[in-house]
Design a protein with these regions (language model features):
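C-terminal motif of bacterial Sec signal peptides marking the signal peptidase cleavage site
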Residues: 16-19
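Bacterial N-terminal signal peptides that target proteins for export
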Residues: 1-8
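Extended, low-polarity segments enriched in aliphatic/aromatic residues
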Residues: 34-330
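Bacterial signal peptide processing site
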Residues: 21-23
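Repetitive helical segments and hydrophobic/amphipathic motifs
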Residues: 11-12
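N-terminal, intrinsically disordered, polar/charged segments of Gram-positive cell-envelope systems
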Residues: 26-33
Length: 330
């Protein structure tokens, strides 16, 4: 049974736009009786199970089709990382006949080289349930960024062009540099090759990972570059994509961290949409409106990195909408 919970009618209606490091303020919601067709829908289910992952995907009404369906996940840096559990996602990946897709990292670690990256994916159980494609194993290619300020193009794994349909299956959590990571980060940094990751992190200054840390821009330029890379991917795939966020193990740290901080707040659930901006916005709203103080660390991480700026900028350049109808599935 589906029941409409609420519609977010403005970008500020639910999430307080606190200054960096600021505290969350009281928020309000506006109830509606029926969803508005022009506003994207975000589907939500609280219990995080393999059956419910399938259920929330089916609610989207868009079937993953084609000979090559890519399921974009993060394979996780180490066994301590909070990457998505294979028991949770196995049935869903089989349902869509998907192949896990990833790209190498731009920093030293277990996933900076293809051979070690495959080994890490194997250790984390992913190769046992579906093929894994490290998309920049054979190099990279570019896709255009329309209307960008920092990037004229995005640098993605060469194999990305082989896929007919994109399933963006993200673990929503905090992030050391972006404040939070969800669908937008997964399609920007996540689909970028190692060189592409350097390109985004430096706001177009260098594609050489060896030069990344010496060329970091001011924070908003990095955040905006992530949004621009996400736009390139969204424009490329068009309507052949779905976006799902699993909001569990809500650490302040990303799955790219080999020794992440333990989660403080409780799991939120599974959310899905055809709009990645609306999806990430709904997840952020749930964090800011969580009913107890266990949310504080994650909110401080988001605010201290000006993390919500990616939502504002992504909406501005046409990636998606921060307005959404939230529908719960029971």
């Amino acid at each position: 049974m589906k029941k409409l919970l609420f519609s977010l009618l403005s970008a500020a209606a639910l999430v307080p736009m606190a200054s960096c490091g600021g505290k969350a303020e009281a928020s309000t919601t506006t109830a509606v009786e029926e969803p508005t067709d022009s506003i994207p829908t975000v589907y939500y289910i609280k219990d995080i199970t393999s059956e419910n992952l399938v259920k929330v995907y089916e609610a989207l009404g868009r079937k993953a089709e084609g000979n090559n369906v890519g399921v974009k996940i993060s394979t996780g840096e180490s066994m301590k990382s909070h990457h998505l559990d294979t028991g949770l996602i196995k049935d869903f990946v089989h349902l869509v006949n998907g192949k896990f897709i990833e790209c190498n990292t731009a920093y030293n670690g277990n996933r900076s080289q293809t051979e070690q990256h495959y080994k890490t994916a194997q250790e984390h159980g992913y190769t046992a349930i579906a093929p894994v494609d490290i998309m920049d194993a054979d190099g990279d290619t570019t896709i255009v960024v329309n209307g960008g300020t920092h990037l004229a193009y995005d640098i993605v794994g060469k194999h990305f062009l082989d896929y007919d349909f994109l399933v963006v299956l993200s673990h929503f959590k905090g992030h050391a540099m972006g404040g939070f990571g969800g669908a937008l980060k997964n399609i920007s940094i996540g689909i970028a090759s190692a060189d592409g990751k350097s390109w985004i992190h430096t706001a177009g200054k260098t594609r050489n990972p060896a030069e990344l840390w010496q060329n970091l821009p001011e924070q908003d330029a990095f955040i905006e570059s992530m949004a621009e890379a996400a736009k390139a991917v969204v424009d490329h795939v068009g309507g052949k994509a779905v976006y799902i966020n699993v909001a569990n193990n809500l650490s302040v740290d990303c799955d790219c961290d080999g020794n992440p901080a333990p989660p403080k707040m409780a799991d939120l659930g599974i959310l899905a949409s055809l709009d990645p901006v609306a999806l990430d916005k709904a997840c952020v709203d749930m964090v800011f409106n969580f009913p107890d103080s266990t949310k504080t660390n994650l909110i401080e991480r988001i605010n201290s990195r000006h993390g919500t700026h990616i939502l504002d900028y992504a909406e501005k350049i046409g990636v998606g909408s921060q307005k959404y109808n939230l529908v719960t599935i029971e």
